[in-house]
Amino acid sequence: MRKPILSLAILLGMATAGQAQETCIEQLKFPEVGRWAEYKAVYNQKDPYTIRYAVVGGERREGKDLKWLELRMVPEKKDGTIIYQMLVPGSAAEVGDVQEIIMKSGARPAMKMDGMMVKMIRGQMDKQSFLKDVCKDVTLVGRERVIVPAGRFQTRHFRSEKYSSESWLADKVPFAMVKAVGKNYEMALIRSGAGAKSSITEVPQSMGPKR
């Protein structure tokens, strides 16, 4: 489960970095339902994946608007697509308050996590703090034109000396991230668009204890 957790940490960590990084965090707004962005990612310089972030739905609970964020990871060297869906507040500042997580690994049934399972996932993501650096302890290098597989983008370039990471963000891209490089990962935008639907069509089973 390590690599999916790292990818969750990238997504959630981007938006929970803290008030000192407002310039960076302001760009990391979650898009409207249906918008998506797909990346080529490499972990530990050896594990290539195609990763898609998407907003696949929305709910209103207890007077608060929530969004279903989906992370889909497709490994290049082996079978076993992994899908995570996270129900989170629509505000980037509150994204750490995950309400539910649904996971599907390969052909296995989709499983729904809540309660203690969600807390455990949060704890694992906290331990992977080196991937929470997209907006953590960063300085703005400046505006920079970057070329990635998706094309050429005018970005804001951020760098963290503490975490040896760099990120390039653009307002026009869903989830804002165009490129990110850290000690153990690299990500570059392949394509983006609208019309994303849930990659999980079945009713998820509960991972909680059976009663």
Where are these regions (language model features)?
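Acidic, serine/threonine-rich low-complexity disordered tracts
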Residues: 21-97, 102-211
